[in-house]
Amino acid sequence: MPFTLHDLDENVTPTLERYCAIPALSPHFDPDWTTSGHLESALQLLAGWVRSRLPEADVREERLEGRTPLLWVEVPAHGEANSDTVVLYGHFDKQPPLGEWSEGLAPFTPVRRGNRLYARGAVDDGYATFAAVSALEEVRRSGGTHPRCVLLIEGSEESGSPDLEAYLDALAERIGRIDLMICLDSGALSYDRLWVTSSLRGLVNVDITVRVLERAQHSGTASGVVPSSFRIIRQLLDRVEDATSGEVLLPEAHCAVPDWVESATRGVAEEFGDVVAQEMPVVEGLELMGRDGADRLVRRTWKPALSVIGLAGAPEPRQAGNVLRTSTTVTLSLRLPPLADARAAGEALVRVLSVDPPSGAEVEVTLTSAASGWAARELPEDLRRILDEASRGSFGGPLALTGEGGTIPFLFQLGQRFPETPFIATGVLGPESNAHGIDEMLNLEAAVNLINALAHLLSHYGGSQ
């Protein structure tokens, strides 16, 4: 008897909803996180639940000076003895609410509607700890065996994982050799099969501030004489992006697209249609970038893209007076293809934006984060077979692989340390999950299916193959 939605509701959902109610914002969004205590509350809740479910596990709340905490769970091998170690990764920090949620929904008030759970952090990535533990319980309940498993659940992923390297160093001896790495923070193009991520984009964030005046001036007096700080921002952005096509102009932000990516995206588009266009809640009449569904998949996963994600220095429209403002600040997000060097791209971005300021304006550019992307090595044939069995048995459909447009710094960091280790990045951030946006949603049926798929993988991997 596999893990069911009833099992989830009995053993997981109540605690998951308590987690969802905690505003455990990542430190980038809550600089006073040590004072607010929300990350600590989330950590304690998860640790307590894991101890109640796996009493034989070594559960520790790891702490390093000046770092967000990390949840360590070590579960010894069960059944047939083998020396393999599987590391399962997730995170408990959250994105901010972003804005007003739909009627009846709120970021930190979990709402169940049918088999959907709405709350910030439900799918990204609160479910991960519960899924990993439930899968291990399911293996044991069904009489199976599993290798030694280590759960690493961090608290700074949504800030670019600045604390993770320090923990990997501190825990390296305790972790030991890693034979399989599973990340539960990735996405899916549909809920009818197990999706394994073949690549992730990198990310560079910078803040640009342009100052033109010591104090604001009446626009009737200063306009036409003093250049607008916003216009200078526009000029600077034109150095980085073609304003008409959206193409990124920095050579360091590009890499060659492998032939297999082109063929794989064509295959996905032929089977699922224009999935990228289908999932975007665009306004009527908007023309999307890209020639077709396959091209849009490539653009989302293997091409750079620039977005303005923050703006300061301007009042709300209702408060706007006829004033030439002193300055404008924007935060840029530059997504990078999987094989681009984030550090090199970040340095190039800062350099291009800083040199020869238009009109002699005061320009300050700050690189706030840089995380390289990741491309998976080809899965070993036996592992791919196990995953396909898990997908068909749990979801109903065959295993599928796709690239993702987001960034998980952990995969690049572990990939550098363990280049020969197979990596599986998967998750239930599927259609309408709205991670990072309003109305974030966890599809509970998909979570159940993933738990069963994960249980199959753990019980058939390693010494029990």
Regions found by a protein language model. Name each.
Residues 93, 240-245, 350-360:
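A common structural junction motif
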Residues 123, 214-216, 334-342, 371:
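A generic structural motif
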Residues 82-153, 449:
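Active-site metal-coordination/substrate-binding segment of hydrolases
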Residues 1-100, 327, 346:
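N-terminal helical capping/dimerization or prosegment-like subdomains
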Residues 43, 81, 190-191, 248-327, ...:
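An extended, acidic, His-containing surface patch that forms the Zn2+-binding/catalytic region
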Residues 146-228:
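Histidine/acidic-residue-rich, glycine-tolerant segments that coordinate divalent metal ions
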